[in-house]
């Protein structure tokens, strides 16, 4: 599965320390390789609000979340936001 980052997610990533950015990048790569398995776990959940239709949340660490969506035509994981749990939604 290909990975694309939105401009907002790139800006979000820059706010993290270098070790955190490495962790986040590794977890996003893991997500792209194991999406179907993670979808059946509690680590990946679909967001339910109308504003977030067809978007998912992935838990990276205790307080770090990634919001993303799957684009059907190319099976691409588009990372929309990366941030702390309290401020990402």
Give the ranges of each region predicted by the language model.
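N-terminal first-folded block
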Residues: 9-42
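A short, surface-exposed loop/turn module that caps and links secondary-structure elements
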Residues: 32-58
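Enriched for short, Lys/Arg-rich terminal
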Residues: 2, 7, 11-15, 22, ...
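A structure-centric signal for secondary-structure junctions around beta-strands
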Residues: 25, 41, 55, 74-76
């Amino acid at each position: 599965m290909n990975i694309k980052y939105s401009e907002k997610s790139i800006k979000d990533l820059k706010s993290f320390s270098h070790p955190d950015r490495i962790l986040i990048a590794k977890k996003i790569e893991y997500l792209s390789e194991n999406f179907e398995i993670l979808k059946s776990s509690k680590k990946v959940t679909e967001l339910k609000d109308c504003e977030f239709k067809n978007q998912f949340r992935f838990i990276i660490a205790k307080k770090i979340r990634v919001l993303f969506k799957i684009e059907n035509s190319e099976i691409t994981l588009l990372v929309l936001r990366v941030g702390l749990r309290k401020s990402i939604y």
